[in-house]
Amino acid sequence: MGNSFDFGVLLILLKYFKSSRSQNGHSKQIRILLLNEMEKLEKTLFRLEQGFELQFRLGPTLQGKPVTVFTNYPFPGETFNREKFRSLEWENPTEREDDSDKYCKLNLQQSGSFQYYFLQGNEKSGGGYIVVDPILRVGADNHMLHLDCVTLQTFLAKCLGPFDEWESRLRVAKESGYNMIHFTPLQTLGLSRSCYSLADQLELNPDFSRPHKKYTWSDVGQLVEKLKREWNVLCITDVVYNHTAANSKWIQEHPECAYNLVNSPHLKPAWVLDRALWHFSCDVAEGKYKNRGVPALIENDHHLNCIRKVIWEDIFPKLHLWEFFQVDVYKAVEKFRGLLTQETWRVIKSDPKQHLKIIQDPEYRRFGCTVDMNIALATFIPHDNGPAAIEECCNWFRKRIEELNSEKHQLMNYHQEQAVNCLLGNVFYERLAGHGPKLGPVTRKYPLVTRYFTFPFEEMPVSTEETMIHLPNKACFFMAHNGWVMGDDPLRNFAEPGSDVYLRRELICWGDSVKLRYGTKPEDCPYLWAHMRKYTEIIATYFQGVRLDNCHSTPLHVAEYMLDAARKLQPNLYVVAELFTGSEDLDNIFVTRLGISSLIREAMSAYNSHEEGRLVYRYGGEPVGSFVQPCLRPLMPAIAHALFMDITHDNECPIVHRSVYDALPSTTIVSMACCASGSTRGYDELVPHQISVVSEERFYTKWNPEALPSNAGEVNFQSGIIAARCAINKLHQELGAKGFIQVYVDQVDEDIVAVTRHSPSIHQSFVAVSRTAFRNPKTSFYSKDVPQMCIPGKIEEVVLEARTIERNISPYRKDENSINGMPNITVEIREHIQLNESRIVKQAGVTTKGPNEYIQEIEFENLSPGSVIIFRVSLDPHAQVAVGILRNHLTQFSAHFKAGSLAVDNSDPILKIPFASIASKLTLAEINQILYRCESEEQEDGGGCYDIPNWSSLKYAGLQGLMSVLAEIRPKNDLGHPFCDNLRSGDWMIDYVSGRLISRSGTIAEVGKWLQAMFFYLKQIPRYLIPCYFDAILIGAYTTLLDIAWKQMSSFVQTGSTFVKHLSLGSVQMCGVGKFPSLPLLSPSLTDVPYRLNEITKEKEQCCVSLAAGLPHFSSGIFRCWGRDTFIALRGLLLITGRYLEARNIILAFAGTLRHGLIPNLLGEGTYARYNCRDAVWWWLQCIQDYCKMVPNGLDILKCPVSRMYPTDDSAPLPAGTLDQPLFDVIQEAMQRHMQGIQFRERNAGPQIDRNMKDEGFTVIAGVNEETGFVYGGNRFNCGTWMDKMGESDRARNRGIPATPRDGSAVEIVGLCKSTVRWLLELSKKNIFPYHEVRVKRHGKVVTVSYEEWNRKIQDNFEKRFHVSEDPSASNEEHPNLVHKRGIYKDSYGASSPWCDYQLRPNFTIAMVVAPELFTAEKAWKALEIAEKKLLGPLGMKTLDPDDMVYCGIYDNALDNDNYNLAKGFNYHQGPEWLWPVGYFLRAKLYFSKLMDRETNARTIFLVKNVLSRHYVHLERSPWKGLPELTNENGQYCPFSCETQAWSIATILETLYDL
């Protein structure tokens, strides 16, 4: 759902704010994870911190379904077990049936990776992982070290020397300001002396001991603890799970731990090739191929081409590698012949999908493969049992086997082609490439290619060697080396069966290490798993973290198992990894499964300063001026936390690749990133070569504050860039600890990068300007003209200025014993100086940009390549005060603003009153003006909605218009949005918001003045901060206003779910008071009618709330109020929400307009009313009934005075108070007139009131059938029900023809009439309603019809006339030939076009809700099932059966063509999916499901919740915050629909009320 969730979160947040302030004033951080059906998020990274609460909530696809969430996050105090899952309990704060607020939660107090999944019923429906960060602690006081504060330095352990000298060498890291040391493995090394080839994982490297003193892990542990406690430095070290040194003693004792030719026979062909290439290499070294163009010293492409030729001509032909994959043709044919000649042989029925194919020999012997003889017998069938037929069959079989063998031969050729290419690529890199190691002549020590397998025996000819591969006691020692495969899938193990990496020579091989074979579980290789677990536990006992070496090649299940063991001993284990997967999705799989805390990111991957700056922005922090995010918000996918390193121990030397002058600026850029940062020992001393993990045997230098620069074995602040590094590291830690979480990167020019770190609470910034030197300044041109820089705010100090300089000392000479750097290069640094003391800044001027923007213009004079300068910048004092005052006033909405707040006495007096106190005096009608009002509503007052240039106008003039946009851009921090641009560019929007409210009167103006007072300070802060604080002010005001609105509503709303509250705002949205009254005036004798002072006449006037039918099309003027729409919506929007007075006034206002026994549809203030609809009066009567039942003392309305505008049909409109009648008299008149029969011609009939209607259509007829009691009316030229589309196309010849006349007795009107008659009967029996009957003249006589008789007639005739029996032989059908759906209820009875009666439409569900007594439960249920199957869409109900010949589900009112059924939107009610009938359908289902069995009822509740969840989603995503009038088929957007419609919202709210 993305950030459409934002509005729902806002509403939850309101409840939450009141209850969850913790003691320290901070609100608990809560993240919400929406669960959606079949959403598998294993590749999505969700990062959380300890102390957070994670809530799982049901997304729309799961609401109403039985969902159970499982997780392996343990109970408090329990040990984590990856395989142990528990279910979470659902909590429902409202305890309602509605699922929109239901959640289950985890309180996160433990670090690591945790899995969750959820079941729908018993089926897994989705899942994913969450990663909880560790909490790192250092120092004697055990204070917290935030991950973004980490400054790490890598040490090659073997270069630390004897253990008793470590402290003096490690002190360099402490003095340089590092707070974490990463040691390469400390274990015994293998023969190659590579730091990562370990001979014994459990033993400390003996090199660290002295002859007289053996050091142990315990000694290492004591040192690590001392560093943590006394130096504030944490220690981590590598874990290497993929390989062990080839000379490891334990691997010889347990060869099953490696990939050998016994447990991995698929490697035999690769081994044979490997041995052949080794012998070829030895021959080349001895000069045996010199005369073939392959000398021992490979020097050019010609030599490479000759190698290719020799391999293809001499080596491959002798090896016959294809034979390992082929069938012995002779043996196979003979076996086949034997089976054919057996007497028991019979034809086997073949599966056409199965074809003859080679079955690989699992032992990989030459010609050891087979085929499935059953398939062969089913494929090659002799036509008789004679020898000739059998021989013919054998020949066909032989031919097929030869073809299959040939395919294997071709495949092997393809593999061999790749093997040669890879081999030559390797030779080129090692011997010819400029960036390669240039190994020189081929020797046994440096062979032509690295061997892929160990061979611990005397050498012998290739053919003799091959015999050993089938001797298990020998073959088990032929072990595969490890390495890496370029571009390979890291989730695939390249040594397992199915991979041809070794055969195709695609492995870049580490010949000193053997790849370890774990299998899928500890039982597959018990010794290896136990050995590596012990190794892990040693590390976890003594170190605070681990670096997963070569993580992308480590089997995930192995790393999971080992890290689980480590976390048992070190719960807050810091896990660092290098990943080279090439894909963020793949990275995320490793991060989420293993709970990796930080991924190593390399600055050396940047090819220029632009890219280096981009990486800073990519790896951490949010943009400067970001929006404040609420403490309760959706859980958003994250990118892995970065450990951003200027150089890793694997990188080539940057001094060689770039220049020595780049060390300082690049390290400054890296350190300004809002993430962990790191480096490698040697970088700061400016060691001008890569310190090799394999060949380097010298020791690091020691710390000596007194040492001279020329002293090769010691270093101090005079050496390299150490002094600057110390200042930069301290700054990095300060920025991380003090919340400088916002980052801005400015690429000033080709070489200069400025990185800003900003604190969003105190609004201080640190700006680091670095001039990189990717090219050597001595040999490349750099301009002396440096661009001027503008820094917004006031520069408080220069925190650091540093320049890389050359000093007069003899240049670098590589020392024999110590890893020494360049003594002649150092940095000149000055810290914490004033701007005027700077040697890099020439001058700094002050200028202003706009009215309040204070800017310092910096001119540089000595910003040479290799220089950096860091400024500490505050807002100018005036802006700083303004921000502080703003934050102080915002603390009433959120404790987040306490930091950096400033209380003053001289602010505007209105700000001394809490906003909630001001707003609490508002009525809902006033809140309508503050929050909503669309363009046409606002235009009535002479205004309009705010228009954002180059984008669009806001949907509402009120705050909701702004909040809808902010809800979209806030979660994404989309500061580049035109909305934000407009705010930064000027005060227009700010002034608009407060100005439109101040121009009104009363409390609305007070709200406007409060906003204006806040905006006074807002305008004084820098423009880049305005979007953030504008949002904060509005969200505080907006959420307060919502809360005040709900407090004025019913308890159903106040205690309701987010969805209920959300819908209830439709009442505020649709009900308002315009500049001109929309309703006729009520009787002056009503004492509680709202009044206002007319600003023009200065006279008191009624100002009753009216209900808009829909926005934006039916919102103002005479088109705002419609009788039918008003009374379909009134129960949901006014009665359920508890707005009883407004409901009463609307009922009475319409009562005053009764004429001809009808309520008008188009109200037109009463004076322009049109009495052309047959159903509005019945909806009005239904609402009076609902009012009486739902409102306390509701029956009192019956006695309320109604001011009759038209006491007779032909009266001129009378002023209010001229003739008052009690409401019960008006009701009786309506009933009497219908029974008498209504017939009249509309006033002013003709094009002046309807330009499309034919003349006959202006005649209005209504009455009651004497026999059935059914209300009837209409004719084929008018449309008097809600399906009221009148044709308007001349081209298609449908002008003046109603698409859906629905004349006769429309089913919903019959239902509404029955409901009213039944109710009046009940009231009359209790003498509450004074009439027991209606009196009418018939044939010159007065006839009485009692309500009892009328009620009985409808009851007796309804199912008889309306139900279409499932039995075709039923005799009650007048037009059996027109029936095309059985088991349904007709849409009408007695239509002039009888086939219209039989159309399936959703109107019968209305009758079911208002008069359920008319329906037999079983028949009703069947009809509802058909309606569900045929009519129910995603949001609405199809208005016509899709099987109907005139069905068309797409409404296009602009289309004018020759199609009679479509032109000019003729199909308005012939298929498009209208929303309001869904409410009645769902309510009917709920009602009748209770009359069925319990399972049916439960299923129905699921259905209702699931359907409603789609409305919830639409409501949240809609910028109008409403539900539309209709959609096109299958829920597609319809541009001709009202974006938010009163009756759509109302009937969904009614459904939730019933639920």
Swiss-Prot record:
Modified residues (Phosphoserine): 87
Enzyme Commission number(s) from the entry: 2.4.1.25, 3.2.1.33
Cellular localisation: Cytoplasm
UniProt function note: Multifunctional enzyme acting as 1,4-alpha-D-glucan:1,4-alpha-D-glucan 4-alpha-D-glycosyltransferase and amylo-1,6-glucosidase in glycogen degradation.
Subunit record text: Monomer. Interacts with NHLRC1/malin.
SUPFAM superfamilies noted in UniProt: (Trans)glycosidases, Six-hairpin glycosidases
GO CC entries: cytoplasm
Protein name (database record): Glycogen debranching enzyme
Coiled coil (UniProt feature): none
GO biological processes: glycogen biosynthetic process; glycogen catabolic process
InterPro entries: 6-hairpin_glycosidase_sf (IPR008928), AGL/Gdb1 (IPR010401), AGL_central (IPR032788), AGL_euk_N (IPR029436), AGL_glucanoTrfase (IPR032792), GDE_C (IPR032790), Glycogen_debranch_met (IPR006421), Glycoside_hydrolase_SF (IPR017853)
Gene that encodes the chain: AGL
Entry's Gene Ontology molecular function annotations: 4-alpha-glucanotransferase activity; amylo-alpha-1,6-glucosidase activity
Alphabetized UniProt keyword annotations: Cytoplasm, Glycogen biosynthesis, Glycosidase, Glycosyltransferase, Hydrolase, Multifunctional enzyme, Phosphoprotein, Transferase, Ubl conjugation
Lineage: Eukaryota, Metazoa, Chordata, Craniata, Vertebrata
Annotated catalytic residues: 549, 552, 650
Reactions it catalyzes: Transfers a segment of a (1->4)-alpha-D-glucan to a new position in an acceptor, which may be glucose or a (1->4)-alpha-D-glucan; Hydrolysis of (1->6)-alpha-D-glucosidic branch linkages in glycogen phosphorylase limit dextrin
Disulfide bridge positions per record: none
Similarity comment text for this entry: Belongs to the glycogen debranching enzyme family.
Entry PTM: The N-terminus is blocked.
NCBIfam families cross-referenced by the UniProt entry: glyc_debranch
